[in-house]
């Protein structure tokens, strides 16, 4: 869930994400954590692929392809990712498609890694969460779809919140879909937001979604202008503006 979405207590939702000491969210993105993050990633990959200690390279990692839509910034990100992976022996090719073709390819799940982006048109974290239910037209990761339908790798325990829900090694439909449905019917604000944090925890535990950056909306506004409003989609509203002299 991106910056700007508020939590039940009025704080930012992302500030309360994850369950880590010393940093916000699911990854420590500080400069001081770079080396330890790198080492953790290498050690994780060593469990599954052959690593040559003398060269610092993986020798049998499958070739990846990064799919992105036309745009210089998207291309630059892909080039950086490809370069960073090449440094440890992982080949990631780049594939550029125009927008409509890109959307269809991604929706069909015909990719190994693909760029994605999302904007919320209202201030509620559910806008970033319900898109990943099995039946969602935006579920391009293919959670619970096709060959992933019967993957039983997810766990969910909501008994501490008063729900008779405890699933071990369940499918996406038995876990994530369930918690999103509960969010949509919950009338208690504190419980509803806690359910959304649990949903995000489950989503991020899959490792299928890797946030790179948040969009920003830069503009200049003179101190004399009052009543200006900019919504989450970047639209600017001046109809209630006044200028103090």
Language-model features: where?
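Bilobed periplasmic-binding protein-like "clamshell/Venus-flytrap" ligand-binding domains
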Residues: 1, 47-70, 114-117, 169-221
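Periplasmic-binding protein-like
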Residues: 1-21, 77, 200-211
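Short, solvent-exposed loop/turn and secondary-structure capping segments
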Residues: 1-4, 77-79, 125-128, 214, ...
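Solvent-exposed loop/turn segments at secondary-structure junctions
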Residues: 5-8, 70-74, 99-101, 119-123, ...
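Short, solvent-exposed loop/beta-turn-alpha elements that line the ligand-binding surface or hinge
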Residues: 11-39, 51-61, 105-109, 130-181, ...
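Bilobed "Venus flytrap"/periplasmic-binding protein-like clamshell domains
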Residues: 38, 68-81
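Hydrophobic alpha-helical packing residues
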Residues: 45, 81-86
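Periplasmic binding protein-like
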Residues: 86-145
